Amino acid sequence: MIKRINIFIITTLLMTISTLASAQDDQNLASFILRNHEASALPTVGNSDAEITVVEFFDYRCGYCAKQAKDFEKILNESENVKIVYLEWPIFGDISDTAAKIALIIWDNYPDKYFDIHNGLMKLGPRMKKESIISLLNENNLDGEKIFNQALGQTENLVINENFKLAKNLGLRGTPASVINDSIYPGYIKYEVLSNLVK
């Protein structure tokens, strides 16, 4: 259900959206990224053979991101034709940055636990603190204190750095923001609209 793709090429690809118009008809932007760059560090959830790909920019302390996450979870439960690529874009301070690094540590080391941790961090939202994050990790049979300190010890994270560059290149100004196939959707997408976009 989960596979990896290459974040380090995505910036270049999305900066050259216009050149993709000459690609094969079935090679839309998001699926082009997935199909050609499978070896890397971006969390992806859903059917690996899905025709619809959503690339989601988010921050764990963003209230609308949490609301959108519930919609995406519902979409994934309803459809096997959608996969979601999660791009950590921590713009709401240090605890957001730490949460993003923790999520990527989980993806790298315990990928089967990623979706549960991701959803748990989303539920913590704006009120998340060190203690609540550690508790969430412990509840999922992980060493919360160790992982939290590991994240704090990262002076920078290449994946997150690239996500920031990508967001800037796309002209994004806040979270959430989504790339669905060839189109960019800034802001929260109502479930009724989202469900139609991913049909």
Label the model's feature ranges.
Residues 2-8, 13-93, 149-174:
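Extracytoplasmic thiol/disulfide redox context detector
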Residues 91-175, 179-199:
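Cysteine-centric redox/oxidoreductase cores and disulfide-bonded domains
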